[in-house]
């Protein structure tokens, strides 16, 4: 259990100022709070200087606590590196963050906001986060952690992307408007039950195949007791299910309301068509990230495609752990692996050994909760390699810097920049600023 292996410290920090979309909050100046958990290994003795600080990101609507068994496995199996701490924050509209912000949230969501929120979190706790930092993200969290690396290219030593939502086109059975798809299910699903036990039974399909440790956390953190702002009248809900008013069972709902899960999965584009003329025109104030060529579609999600298109520039090394039975477009993800880090500003990519893919056959998108040990083992092999490289690079940097002046430039500057000839006439710059 995580509490046996880690000291868990909770934090509440402000989110980034000015959200990507004006409709993300009730009022545009609202200050959102981000709920953070810091997992510090219980250990004897000092922490090594090169111990890793992990920054982790979760999937849509998935409580951050579901990943705790993965942290346990990383700690148990760690060889060739040490863990300083693991930091994980709920997206502002989800889970514990969502509860803190529920009076300020509205019906829009940009994945880019959480990348900025994490950058502010890291800056806030910088004294506890010396290098190396490693990013690990699952699903849309893999997209978010990649965008954080775009924001600050030298922040992460390496990235671990677990079935990341980075692709050019929507997945089949994923984001189409016709059923079956994830968004149809999200909008039309039941989201209130007479008791936690009934809720667990009703959602057993989602929990199928989960590691018992993850299943335990799912039952605790995926549901929330009523009342909530969405369902304030507990007695009315009890009456709906025929439960007596004096019953001791408490109705529950989803910790992340289904509407916030929906708008994180997909974004509406309902107003691009002028009702009078029928003309399609992108409303730039609110939908500047909409591709004008497809502005006629009513729903879209910009981040998977925009993130894919920047993969060539990704600076940190990167391990892609891909679920062989994922519902995502696996062929497109693998195309992303091929170009990852290969361009100007990038890591060097696959040819330089800086990017690697591992496909886990038969594993589904929820593999961090179903195949915890295998996912951890896959990450550890990569981390051993990357930490060896980090230490070598650090040693070389210190050797190269030894004895250098920090007050004046080195001699090579004088060799490259030629001196101004003596006796040269002074330029007449009168009249110029």
Swiss-Prot record:
**What positions constitute the catalytic site?**
139, 163, 365
Compartments where located: Peroxisome matrix
Gene name in the database record: mpaH'
* Listed name of the protein: Type I acyl-CoA thioesterase mpaH'
Where is it chiefly localized?
other
Question: Changing residue 365 to A: reported impact?
Answer: Abolishes the acyl-CoA thioesterase activity
Q: Does the keyword Hydrolase apply?
A: yes
EC top class, in one word? hydrolase
Cite the EC number: 3.1.1.-
Single GO biological process annotation from the record: mycophenolic acid biosynthetic process
The residues listed in the UniProt record as binding substrate, with positions renumbered to this chain, are 60, 140
User: For this protein, what is any one GO molecular function term?
Assistant: fatty acyl-CoA hydrolase activity
Q: What happens when the gene is disrupted?
A: Retains the ability to produce MPA, albeit with an about 50% lower yield, and accumulates 2 compounds (MFDHMP-d4 and MFDHMP-d5) with an even shorter isoprenyl chain than MPA.
Which is a Pfam family this sequence falls into?
Abhydrolase_6
Annotated catalysed reactions: mycophenolyl-CoA + H2O = mycophenolate + CoA + H(+)
Which keywords does UniProt give here? Answer: Hydrolase, Peroxisome
Note the superkingdom of the native organism.
Eukaryota
């Amino acid at each position: 259990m995580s509490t046996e292996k880690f000291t868990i410290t909770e934090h509440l920090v402000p989110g980034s100022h000015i959200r990507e979309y004006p409709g993300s909050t009730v009022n545009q100046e609202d200050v959102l709070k981000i709920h953070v958990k810091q997992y510090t290994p219980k250990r004897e003795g000092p922490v090594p200087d090169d111990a890793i600080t992990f920054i982790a990101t979760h999937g849509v609507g998935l409580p951050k606590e579901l990943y705790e068994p993965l942290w346990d496995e990383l700690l148990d199996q760690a060889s060739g590196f040490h863990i300083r701490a693991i930091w994980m924050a709920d997206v502002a509209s989800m889970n514990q963050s969502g509860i803190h912000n529920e009076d300020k949230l509205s019906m829009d969501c940009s994945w880019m906001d959480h990348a900025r929120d994490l950058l502010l979190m890291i800056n806030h706790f910088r004294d506890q986060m010396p290098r190396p930092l490693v990013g690990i993200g699952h699903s849309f969290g893999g997209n978010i952690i990649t965008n954080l690396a775009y924001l600050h290219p030298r922040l992460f030593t390496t990235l671990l992307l677990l079935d990341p939502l980075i692709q050019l086109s929507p997945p089949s059975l994923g984001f189409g408007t016709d059923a079956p798809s994830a968004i149809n299910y999200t909008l039309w699903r039941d989201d209130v039950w007479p008791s936690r036990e009934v809720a667990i039974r009703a959602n057993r399909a989602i929990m199928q195949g989960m590691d018992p440790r993850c299943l335990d956390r799912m039952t605790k953190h995926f549901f929330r007791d009523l009342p909530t702002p969405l369902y304030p009248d507990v007695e009315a809900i009890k009456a709906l299910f025929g439960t007596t008013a004096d019953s001791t069972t408490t109705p529950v709902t989803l910790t992340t309301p289904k509407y916030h899960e929906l708008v994180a999965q997909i974004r509406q584009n309902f107003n691009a068509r002028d009702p009078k003329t029928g003309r399609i025109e992108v409303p730039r104030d609110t939908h500047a990230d909409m591709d004008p060529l497809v502005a006629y579609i009513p729903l879209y999600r910009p981040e998977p495609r925009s993130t894919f298109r920047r993969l060539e520039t990704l600076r940190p090394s990167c391990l892609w752990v891909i679920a062989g039975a994922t519902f995502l477009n696996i062929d497109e993800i693998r195309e992303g692996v091929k170009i990852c880090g290969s361009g100007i500003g990038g890591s060097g990519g696959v040819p330089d050994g800086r990017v690697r893919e591992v496909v886990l056959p038969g594993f589904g998108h929820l593999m961090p909760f179903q195949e915890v040990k295998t996912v951890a083992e896959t990450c550890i092999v990569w981390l051993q390699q990357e930490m060896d490289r980090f230490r070598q690079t650090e040693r070389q940097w210190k050797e190269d810097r030894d004895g250098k002046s920090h007050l004046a430039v080195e001699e090579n500057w004088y060799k490259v920049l030629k001196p101004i000839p003596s006796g040269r006439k002074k330029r007449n710059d009168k009249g110029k600023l």
